[in-house]
Amino acid sequence: MLPRHTDPIAAIATAPGRGAVGIVRVSGRGIGPLVEALCGRALRPREATYLPFRDAGGQAIDQGLALYFPAPHSYTGEDVLELQAHGGPVVLQLLLARCLQAAGEADRATGRPRLPGLRLARPGEFTERAFLNDKIDLAQAEAIADLIDASTEAAARSASRSLAGAFSDEIHRLRDALVHLRMLVEATLDFPEEEIDFLRKADAHGQLAALQRTLAEVMGRTRQGALLREGIKVVIAGQPNAGKSSLLNALAGAELAIVTPIAGTTRDKVQQTIQIEGVPLHVIDTAGLRESDDEVERIGIERAWQEIAAADAVLFLHDLTRAGQPDYEAADAEIAARLARMAPAHVPVVDVWNKSDRAEGSAAAGQGGVATASASGRAAAVRLSARTGEGLDGLRRVLLDIAGWQSAPEGIYTARARHLEALRAVDMHLMEAAAQLQCDGPALDLLAEELRLAQQALNAITGEFTSDDLLGVIFSSFCIGK
C-alpha cells in the first residue's frame, strides 16, 4: 500500500504562469467543515457557486466559483472542493495557503481542527487517489497523462479512448477467458478421481487457441497505440552540405535549422517532432560527418554519432550533384562503413538522394520518389529535392513503413511500452501452456502455473497486481494538481 494515501491533500491544479482562470483543488474525507470555512456557507453538491474568497482576517483575496463534489461522486472518489479564481500565480498561492491555514484552525462547532493533516499533494496524487479508490484502473490513469502529453490529434483521440476504457475492456475480456481456462485446469487437478475429463470435454485446446488468436489481435492494436504515443526517433546524417538541414525544414514545414552554402554550418543537433498520419516522428538534424580540425565542430560530429547509435531509423543523405566525384564517394563509403558498425543491426538506414532538381543529366537523377537500388547495398533508396518538395511523399511513406504503422484502424487506443512487455509475457506463458497441452498426459500443475503467470501479467496492465514501485514511477510523471 502506498504511504500516506489517506491524508487530505491540496494543490494548484492548473499550469504554472498567468491565465484567465486558475484552480485550487482539495481532496480528502470529511472536508465539509473546511468547505464552509473557505466559502462562508455550505455548498450544494455539484453546483457552481459564485462567491468571494477571503483570508483569515476577512479581507477578499478574489472572487470566483466554488464547486463541491461529495464522495464517491468525484474525480478522486473522496470529497473534492475546487476553487476557481483568476489565474494569477499570487492569487492562487494565497488561496492555497488559506486552504492549508483554515484546515488547521479549530471548527467553531466541534473545537477540533477542520481538516487535520491537510498537506500539499505530490505530483499525480489526485489521479493516484482515483486509482486507489477504484474510479479508474492503471491503464486509464496512464491514459490521462498520455492525453495531456499528446503531440498529435491521433494520439489525443487514442488516449481519450483508453481513458474511456477501450484498452482496459480488451484486457478484461482476455482475463475472463483465461480465468475460465484456469478453472478447467484447477478442476481437473482438484478432482483427479472423477471420471470426467474436464479439459477434453470443454475443448481446452480450442479455448487456448482462441485465446492466443485474440491476444495476437490485441497485441497488434497495442503496438499501433504505443507507436502513436512514443513515435520513433529519426536521425538525418551525411556529409556537410548534403542538405540535411533543408530536409528537416522541409519535413517540418518551417525554417528550424540554418541553411547556408558554408560547409559545417550545423554544429549541434536540431530536433523537431513532426507528424505523418498522426504518428509522431522525432527528427534530428546533425552536424555534417567529416574529419575536422575545428574543436567545436568535432564535438558536434561526435554527438551526431551518439544520436545515430540511439536512433530508430537513420536517413543517410547524399548530394546528387556530387555523385560520381571520387573524393565525395570515398567519403560516403567511409560513412557507410561506420554506420554499419555504429547503428544497431535492427535499425534501418535509408539512403536519401537529395537535390534531384539540380542533378539533370546525373545517372542517379529522376522524378523523385522511391528508387529501386541503394548505393550502399541496402534494399531501397529515396530520391528527392528538399528545396522543391519533390519526392518528400515517398520519404514519408518509407518512414511510416519503418515505424510499422498501418492506416489507423477504428477504435485504436493509446498504449505504452510496459503494456507491450506485459502482453509479450502473456504470449510466452500461453505458448508454454499450449506445449504442455500437446503432451501425452500433460503436467497439469505446470499448465496451471503458466496460466496463472499469464493472468498475473494481464493484471499488471490494469493495476490489479502491480508493485508499489511501479505505481510510484507512473504517478510521479504527472504534474502537481492532477
Swiss-Prot record:
Residues 231-404 form the TrmE-type G domain. GTP binds at residues 241-246, 260-266, 285-288, 385-387. Keywords: Cytoplasm, GTP-binding, Hydrolase, Magnesium, Metal-binding, Nucleotide-binding, Potassium, tRNA processing. PROSITE patterns: G_TRME. K(+) binds at N241, T260, I262, T265. The keyword Ligase does not apply. Coiled coil: none annotated. Binds 1 potassium ion per subunit. Disulfide bonds: none annotated. Its cofactor is K(+). It is found in: Cytoplasm. It holds the Pfam family MnmE_helical. GO terms for molecular function: GTP binding; GTPase activity; metal ion binding. GO terms for cellular component: cytosol. Mg(2+) binds at S245, T266. InterPro entries: G_TrmE (IPR031168), GTP-bd (IPR006073), GTP-bd_TrmE_N (IPR018948), GTPase_MnmE (IPR004520), MnmE_dom2 (IPR027368), MnmE_helical (IPR025867), P-loop_NTPase (IPR027417), Small_GTP-bd (IPR005225). (6S)-5-formyl-5,6,7,8-tetrahydrofolate binds at R25, E82, K135, K482. Its main location: cytoplasm. Its EC number is 3.6.-.-. One of its GO terms (biological process) is tRNA methylation. Homodimer. Heterotetramer of two MnmE and two MnmG subunits. Exhibits a very high intrinsic GTPase hydrolysis rate. Involved in the addition of a carboxymethylaminomethyl (cmnm) group at the wobble position (U34) of certain tRNAs, forming tRNA-cmnm(5)s(2)U34. Belongs to the TRAFAC class TrmE-Era-EngA-EngB-Septin-like GTPase superfamily. TrmE GTPase family. This is tRNA modification GTPase MnmE. The gene is mnmE.
